[in-house]
Amino acid sequence: PIAGSMVLAAILLKLGGYGMIRMMQILPTTKTDMFMPFIVLALWGAILANLTCLQQTDLKSLIAYSSISHMGLVVAAIIIQTPWGLSGAMALMIAHGFTSSALFCLANTTYERTHTRILIMTRGFHNILPMTTTWWLLANLMNIAIPPSMNFTGEFLIMSALFNWAPTTIILLGLSMLITASYSLHMFLSTQMGPTQLNNQTEPTHSREHLLMTLHLIPLMMISMKPELIT
């Protein structure tokens, strides 16, 4: 069920990251090469999850792997235990919690009208449900971490912290973010552009669906503009 996916991506996945932050306090905080294999493993896992997103034809699976890839960046930031790294990890977990939950909500909106999650079968929604296309665009821009969103703040802090700790990590980070932008654009174009496959009369969007998306994106934008709300 989609509600379970929203709770899993928005809350349960982030609880694991919070638990790691608490448990990492027992390890040494000084710079040591002991952490390098784990950082490389976390970033490589993020890249592999992003590449898996590019191969997905199932919309729900694509969003799920997207959440996994972002948590790879969070894990890498938590491991080095610097103030910027931990701040970026917390910011990205909160921001991506809203973003991934919103994407799952939009996937359910599409599924209720097409009864399929296959990307090629959900094309052409910009002609049928233009307001939903706007929500898709905003959610994908947040997923890409466009400035001045909180997603961008989190990723920028993580990138700065990892670069200061080990400059070579910028290669894996840059590759991960490039692939993230690629699959986000692919997801948006596959669900909204092109000729529609629907032959029957499509049910219009309901006020509750717009309210649900508003309750996801408005808090995220407010936190992006005023981070003091969560500090």
Swiss-Prot record:
This is NADH-ubiquinone oxidoreductase chain 4. It catalyses: a ubiquinone + NADH + 5 H(+)(in) = a ubiquinol + NAD(+) + 4 H(+)(out). It comes from Bothriechis schlegelii. It is found in: Mitochondrion membrane. Core subunit of the mitochondrial membrane respiratory chain NADH dehydrogenase (Complex I) that is believed to belong to the minimal assembly required for catalysis. Complex I functions in the transfer of electrons from NADH to the respiratory chain. The immediate electron acceptor for the enzyme is believed to be ubiquinone. The gene is MT-ND4. One of its GO terms (biological process) is ATP synthesis coupled electron transport. The chain crosses the membrane at residues 1-21, 34-54, 63-85, 89-111, 128-148, 156-176. The keyword Electron transport applies. The keyword Membrane applies. One of its GO terms (molecular function) is NADH dehydrogenase (ubiquinone) activity. Keywords: Electron transport, Membrane, Mitochondrion, NAD, Respiratory chain, Translocase, Transmembrane, Transmembrane helix, Transport, Ubiquinone. It is a multi-pass membrane protein.
